[in-house]
């Protein structure tokens, strides 16, 4: 039975024999002693395996190359080398899988662009090993947070007939013959399709999540979402993961309070439970990352009305690339100026103009704004977007009519307001944006295992 390297280094007893397995990061020989850097993915540094010339294991050294997979049995001993407390003195080595000089991940620095081309191998690198361990632990932390706060986990559908955001950026799901689909009045007849109507991959689980919040009070979804948005930017991908909580009997203030508690928790979790990875990111990816994340974990989260945000941006004297006017959405440059220069920390922007927000957001008494909020943080700007949902059936129907949104496809959503409706609120947090923020990585393609972007669906 093999021992995980991370557990061996933290719990192993010096002088005892252990069996480990992993992949060779590097091999060097000095004065008749071989030093193998072996990593099984459980930690950043792996472990140093020492093979002395008189050991039977030394006979395998000539066949070992970077990238090989090995099984090693040996004695755990104190290490005289700097930077490591213990190492494994090998007694036997078995080569499980061979490698050669053509292995793409030789011991040198590779660009992120190159590593994207070998996404099937990049998890073996230090940087991406750290990224995906952090991603895994954060996913576990998200479930722990909501479980500890009595939220129900809901699996919302991947295939849907609704477009929550109303942007028409759905990937279509169809079994019709693309070359000769059945036609109705000259157009494809989706009534003959698998589901009997147009369907696509979900852009959000929010609408379905609301239905469960109106039965279980507090729920959350955490799953993949899809946007057929032809954007080749470091912040956009066609497939990504979203965390979307919904709370019944809650207003915008409750929504912001939950978002603040959630972000604080995740920042503290990363600092405390992923300390090795976070220290690596601070050294290799973004100097000062630890302090930046620590400040967010400890800061006061300012609440600022959209009206005030516009006024303060206009008074700043800064010439922005995008105009600053009431009624226009804030761009990333505006968001970052607010959080980095005006506030100097996290900030909620509250109550946006209704004309730039979605139909489901609750109209405020002024009929000019809706109960919407964005959480802005230094370095990235918006990281969370949310709102109080419109619970009044007549107001919701009027808003849909105003925007030309058909009622029939959303009959079930409207019916939820007919019986036992109540104030409710929720928000969305893009999981990849969270991983980028906590790791310092600057491209979404580098925080998801196999990125899906325009004209790229390999692996």
Swiss-Prot record:
Q: What does the entry list under GO cellular component? A: cytoplasm
Q: What EC number(s) does the entry state?
A: 6.1.1.22
Q: Could you give a GO molecular-function term held by this entry? A: asparagine-tRNA ligase activity
Q: Quote the catalytic activity from the record.
A: tRNA(Asn) + L-asparagine + ATP = L-asparaginyl-tRNA(Asn) + AMP + diphosphate + H(+)
Its predominant location is cytoplasm
Q: What is the annotated localization of this protein?
A: Cytoplasm
Q: Has the keyword ATP-binding been applied to this entry?
A: yes
* An annotated GO BP: asparaginyl-tRNA aminoacylation
Provide the alphabetized UniProt keywords. Aminoacyl-tRNA synthetase, ATP-binding, Cytoplasm, Ligase, Nucleotide-binding, Protein biosynthesis
Query: Which family, according to the similarity comment?
Result: Belongs to the class-II aminoacyl-tRNA synthetase family.
Q: Which PANTHER family did the record assign?
A: ASPARAGINE--TRNA LIGASE, MITOCHONDRIAL-RELATED (PTHR22594:SF34), ASPARTYL/LYSYL-TRNA SYNTHETASE (PTHR22594)
Q: Subunit info?
A: Homodimer.
Provide the protein name: Asparagine--tRNA ligase
Q: Which species is this UniProt entry from?
A: Pelobacter propionicus (strain DSM 2379 / NBRC 103807 / OttBd1)
